[in-house]
A protein has these predicted regions:
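Active-site microenvironment for binding and transforming phosphate-containing groups
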Residues: 1-174
């Protein structure tokens, strides 16, 4: 039913909202939602960013994350997992990473790359040099590794939204 679908007004932030009966009808401004409410579908809309669906079977908690580079950089994944754990979830958490821009399609300038490396020198592993002014960024791997830090079980739907124009919308291609 349409009444059971909840979408967010996505803001490229690190804000996570826990959905409860009291805030279900309100406009949700965030980039992640989690809930224990049964028969509720959570939705995320992307156009190259990474959609992530999360599930804790034991505690019956579901969540979704809109993770573009800004949100991933600002710890949207960490904030979401911590919010789920705050709901008494110390069991196995499962995540599915959906279609997003691929590592060979995400061209960035060196300023972008330096921003990530300044945060952590280890972030160099998510970049490969394209030419003297540009690099390619592996957003999917960056997001995967952020989930792995919390020992989340991860599945991938490996499609490149930029390259697969017949199947997906791409912000960068438009």
């Amino acid at each position: 039913k349409k009444d059971n679908l909840v979408l967010m007004y996505q803001t490229h932030s690190n804000k996570v909202v826990e959905l409860k009966k009291q805030n279900l009808k309100k406009k949700i401004k965030a980039d992640a939602m989690v809930t224990r409410i049964k028969n509720l579908a959570l939705g995320v809309v992307t156009a190259d960013c990474v959609p992530i669906l999360i599930y804790d079977k034991k505690n019956q908690i579901v969540g979704c994350i809109h993770s573009g580079w800004k949100g991933a950089f600002a710890d949207i994944i960490k904030n979401t997992i911590l919010k789920i754990k705050k709901l008494n979830s110390n069991s196995e958490i499962y995540a599915s990473i959906g279609p997003c821009i691929g590592k060979n399609s995400y061209e960035v300038d060196l300023k972008f790359q330096k921003k990530f490396i300044k945060k952590s020198k280890k972030n160099i592993r998510y970049f490969s040099k394209k030419n003297k002014n540009k690099s390619l960024f592996n957003l999917r791997k960056f997001v995967h590794d952020k989930l792995s830090e919390f020992r989340v079980n991860i599945d991938h739907v490996k499609h490149d939204t930029f390259k697969e124009k017949d199947n997906f919308f791409s912000f960068r291609r438009s």
